[in-house]
Every structure is written in structure tokens, then in C-alpha cells.
């Protein structure tokens, strides 16, 4: 006679906590600094969530964001616009149970290691860490032109931008994952602003409608607008997976990808006369 009994006493109903903080510093019209932090511990969840739906790990996040108008650091006569942006953020997820032995709590796995170096090594493997860094200069330009008519060589005709972003990820199955991006833009925009030349207007005084076409005939010797844009973008991606059978083995193949693109465009708008309108656009996309 077999008598099987399955008895369920209770759930591990330990609660967790969460906290969030934010600090914002405004330095007049020069800069803005924002610092934020967020934390959630094991067992935290909404009131209506069941035990299985609550967080089963510890989450820690913090970030620093800065906006700076570097042109404000120079004399006003320079008339430089240089918006600078920088951000740094990090997210760390600490598991409740050892991912290498899911029946053992992480605290017990760490207590079983005698050396501090061994405990640090286990944390580096089991913790999921994501780090983001971003830096950009958007729309850097001089707002000054010559006192007379706009000239092709005026610094105000040029606008440049630069951006760099790095994302680094590591965890139990990933030794390292790196994603880096660069972007550089250089734009040139020139509008001569030259008046239309009407060579016959001063010669023909008659208001006759028959001579109106000749009298009002106008020539634009220069284009109305010339626009050039050059864009360089580069991306590098690298992935090194972790050998869970042999944690010290770093011979797994490295996966990587790289792109380097150079895109150029030209736009020309020219009305040689009042009756003739000319527009030209050209673009080139190249992979380096």
C-alpha cells in the first residue's frame, strides 16, 4: 500500500523596498546638471502582485546628465554656439540565487568562498552590469558674418556636430559586449542675398505694356542658395560569450561587426532670371 502526501505550508513572503532620488542643479543659462538614482530590492512589487510576480533580484541604477553651453564661457563678441551634452548611467542587477547553481542563494555561494578575490570574481560573473556613456556637441557654429554682404568664407556658413556613444554589458552568459558609435557632421550653407540685376530698367523709361517684359527683365548672376552636407558615421560592435562549463576559458570565438559610412549631399537653387528656375540635388553614400 502506497500513501503519497504533498503538503504545502506557506510561501517565502519576504517583502522588499524601493527608493528613488533626483538632484537638479541649474547654473543660470550656462549649464544644467541632473543626478538621479533608483534602487529596488528582492521582494519588491505592487500591492496587487503575487509572490511570483515580485522582483527576484536587487536592482541599482544611477545616472549623471550635463548640458553645457560652452559658448557662454567665451566673450560675447565671439558669438559662438556650442551646446555640449554628456551623460553617464550604470545599471547593476544582483541575482537572489546563484545563476551557476540556481538552488543556492547568492549569499550562501559567497559565504562558501574563503578568499575575497574569489567572491569578487563570482560577483563579476553573476551580476548583470550595463554602462552607458554619451557625449555630443550639436550645432557648433559662429553666429557672426561680415558687416557687408554675406561672403562664401564666413564662419557663420559652417555648422558642425559630433557625437560619441559607448554601451558596455556584462553578465552570466556574456563576458563582455561593447557597442561604440561615432558620428560627425559638417554642413555648409551659403545664401549670397544679392539683388536681381535689371539692366534695361534704367534705359527704358516708357511704361508701355509692350516693353514691360524687356524693362522688367532681371538676371541673378549668383545662386540663391548653396548647401553642402558631409556625414561620417562609424560603429564597432564586439561580443565575447562566457563558457559556463569552464569559467576560466576565454577561447570562445569573438564576434564583432564594424561599419564606416560617409554620406555627402549637395543642393543648389538658382533662378537665373525671373522666369527661369533651376534646382539641383545630388547625394553620394559610400562605405569605407
Task: List each model region and its residues.
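Exposed, low-structure sequence patches enriched in small/polar residues
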Residues: 1-288
